[in-house]
């Protein structure tokens, strides 16, 4: 598991930190994007509806059955900041490793 914690449905599999590689973390994220200039009220409504859908037990169970943990962001801005920080973090890693597109 490359996340910071074990996934409940795969509890026997240790995290990378538990397996001897502390500091390594990577989590896949699924989110929606909207065109630049989308009104904040529209973004807020989308966030509200998605958060509500992810709280429905049957929907949550479908995600969990695929080893995915629904974790809606606090707000559209929070998700955008998270994604920007991941681009910066992973970009630095790619540059440090000298990885080039082929």
Where are these predicted regions, by residue range?
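Conserved, function-defining micro-sites of small-solute handling proteins
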Residues: 1-102
């Amino acid at each position: 598991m490359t996340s910071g914690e074990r996934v409940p449905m795969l509890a026997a599999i240790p995290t990378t930190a538990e397996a001897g590689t502390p500091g390594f973390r990577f989590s896949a994220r699924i989110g929606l994007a909207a065109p630049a200039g989308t009104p904040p009220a529209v973004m807020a409504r989308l966030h509200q509806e998605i958060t509500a859908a992810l709280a429905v037990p049957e929907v949550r169970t479908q995600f969990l059955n695929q080893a995915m943990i629904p974790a809606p962001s606090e707000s559209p801005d929070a998700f955008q900041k998270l994604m920007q920080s991941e681009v910066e973090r992973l970009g630095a890693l790619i540059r440090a490793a000298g990885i080039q597109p082929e």
